[in-house]
């Protein structure tokens, strides 16, 4: 079983409009509300793929109850309740444009943060792999993910970590390392304080920087150009076919689902990388975020090429 962790989930609300009128009333006919957050996208894709998944994180108030109720019934759930209210994230779809209003989210009390660590520690007993995704809510220390990674390491559970900014920096500077990280070029540039290109020789040098020491897998998305990866001392380039992109949002989360599934099933390097890329591509072909059509899985799978470089 895979444990997904979403520390700052949201209710994602979609308002489709023909036109967004400013400083007046806009009436919406069809409103969509879903359980949102990067970790819950991972959860949905794992469930659709057929893997057993347990979802956890922080929820609060009436919106927190709504969120838990609107997660697929096939998914096991064990969220931790806090005093603060789970946030809304609003997307106004007008014409070919999308305007977003994102709430900051609740402020987590120090004791709640400590109590969740105990909650997380207990959940580790019943899972084989951990996937941690997304931002930290206000109130938690910047090195909180390092604390989760430490507990998972102590329990012998591999961790796939998908975060960015100061939270990722804190983990990289910690002695407690995740099994997998999946930065993109922009995030690598931010971490190193210099521009990082997609040149394979440069990426090889970058991923051997001391900052990344001790991390077994580093998987770098190159968008339409595929993926560059480092596993131990071995480097790989994944070439992907061109596809018709409908909605790329959530493709990174779907990739995390594939990585986590590959670890769960102890797949070869090539199998893990292909699965991760295929799930990311399948998400991009769907209108709904964090959703894959498994009927197209094998067709794409057979087109991917993994090369050791």
Swiss-Prot record:
The keyword NADP does not apply. It comes from the Bacteria. Pfam families: PfkB. This is Tagatose-6-phosphate kinase. Keywords: ATP-binding, Kinase, Lactose metabolism, Nucleotide-binding, Transferase. It is an enzyme of class 2 (transferase). The gene is lacC. Belongs to the carbohydrate kinase PfkB family. LacC subfamily. One of its GO terms (biological process) is lactose catabolic process via tagatose-6-phosphate. Its EC number is 2.7.1.144. InterPro entries: Carboh/pur_kinase_PfkB_CS, LacC, PfkB_dom, Ribokinase-like, Tagatose/fructose_Pkinase.
């Amino acid at each position: 079983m895979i444990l997904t962790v979403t520390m700052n989930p949201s209710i994602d609300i979609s308002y489709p409009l023909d036109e967004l009128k400013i400083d007046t009333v806009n009436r919406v006919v069809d409103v969509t509300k879903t359980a949102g957050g990067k970790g819950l996208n991972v959860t949905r894709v794992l469930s659709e793929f057929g893997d057993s998944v347990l979802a956890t994180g922080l929820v609060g108030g009436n919106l927190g109850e709504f969120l838990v109720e609107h997660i697929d019934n096939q998914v096991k759930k064990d969220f931790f309740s806090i005093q603060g209210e789970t946030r809304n994230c609003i997307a106004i779809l007008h014409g070919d444009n999308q305007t977003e209003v994102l709430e900051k989210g609740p402020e987590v009390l120090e004791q709640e943060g400590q109590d969740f660590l105990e909650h997380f520690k207990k959940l580790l007993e019943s899972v084989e792999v951990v996937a941690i995704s997304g931002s930290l809510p206000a109130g938690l220390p910047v090195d909180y993910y390092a604390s989760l990674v430490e507990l998972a390491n102590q329990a012998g559970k591999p961790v796939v970590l998908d975060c960015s900014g100061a939270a990722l920096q804190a983990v990289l500077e910690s002695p407690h390392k995740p099994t997998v990280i999946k930065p993109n070029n922009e995030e690598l540039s931010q971490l190193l304080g210099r521009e990082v290109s997609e040149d394979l020789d440069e990426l090889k040098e970058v991923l051997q920087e001391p900052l990344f020491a001790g991390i077994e897998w580093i998987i770098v998305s190159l968008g339409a150009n595929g993926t560059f990866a480092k596993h131990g001392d071995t480097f790989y380039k994944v070439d992907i076919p061109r596809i018709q992109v409908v909605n790329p949002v959530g493709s990174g989360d779907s990739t995390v689902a594939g990585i986590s599934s590959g670890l769960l099933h102890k797949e070869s390097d090539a199998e893990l990388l292909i699965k991760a890329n295929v799930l990311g591509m399948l998400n991009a072909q769907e209108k709904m975020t964090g959703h894959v059509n498994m009927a197209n899985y094998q067709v794409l799978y057979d087109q991917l090429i993994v090369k050791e470089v």
